[in-house]
C-alpha cells in the first residue's frame, strides 16, 4: 500500500474543503488564491492558509464533539 497523506478521508468533502480554503485565504487578504500560482507565493503565505484552515477544522471538530454548534 502507498502512504499518501493527500488522500481525503471523505472524498465527498473535497468541494467544501476547497471552498473553505478560498474563504480563509480571502480572510487573510489573499483574494486570488484559487487562480494564483502557489509556487510564486511565499511559504509563509501558503503556511498561513493551511495553518488557519487546520485551526478552524480542529475548532469545528471540538465543537461537534462537545455537542455545540455555531
Swiss-Prot record:
* GO BP terms: DNA topological change; sporulation resulting in formation of a cellular spore
Name the residues annotated as site: Cleavage: 23-24
Q: Name one Pfam family in it.
A: SASP
Q: Which GO terms describe its molecular function?
A: double-stranded DNA binding
Q: Which UniProt keywords apply?
A: DNA-binding, Sporulation
Gene3D superfamilies linked to this entry: Small, acid-soluble spore protein, alpha/beta type-like
* InterPro entries listed in its UniProt record: SASP_alpha/beta-type, SASP_alpha/beta-type_CS, SASP_DNA-binding, SASP_sf_alpha/beta
Q: Which domain of life is it from?
A: Bacteria
Keyword field contains DNA-binding: yes
Chain segments annotated as transmembrane? none
Family the UniProt entry places it in: Belongs to the alpha/beta-type SASP family.
Note, other: SASP are degraded in the first minutes of spore germination and provide amino acids for both new protein synthesis and metabolism.
Q: What does this protein do?
A: SASP are bound to spore DNA. They are double-stranded DNA-binding proteins that cause DNA to change to an a-like conformation. They protect the DNA backbone from chemical and enzymatic cleavage and are thus involved in dormant spore's high resistance to UV light.
User: What is the protein name given in its UniProt record?
Assistant: Small, acid-soluble spore protein alpha
Amino acid at each position: 500500500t502507498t502512504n499518501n497523506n493527500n488522500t481525503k478521508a471523505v472524498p465527498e468533502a473535497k468541494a467544501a474543503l476547497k471552498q473553505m480554503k478560498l474563504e480563509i485565504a480571502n480572510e487573510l487578504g489573499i483574494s486570488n488564491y484559487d487562480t494564483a500560482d502557489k509556487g510564486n507565493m511565499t511559504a509563509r503565505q501558503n503556511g498561513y492558509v493551511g495553518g488557519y484552515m487546520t485551526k478552524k477544522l480542529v475548532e469545528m471538530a471540538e465543537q461537534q464533539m462537545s455537542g455545540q454548534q455555531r
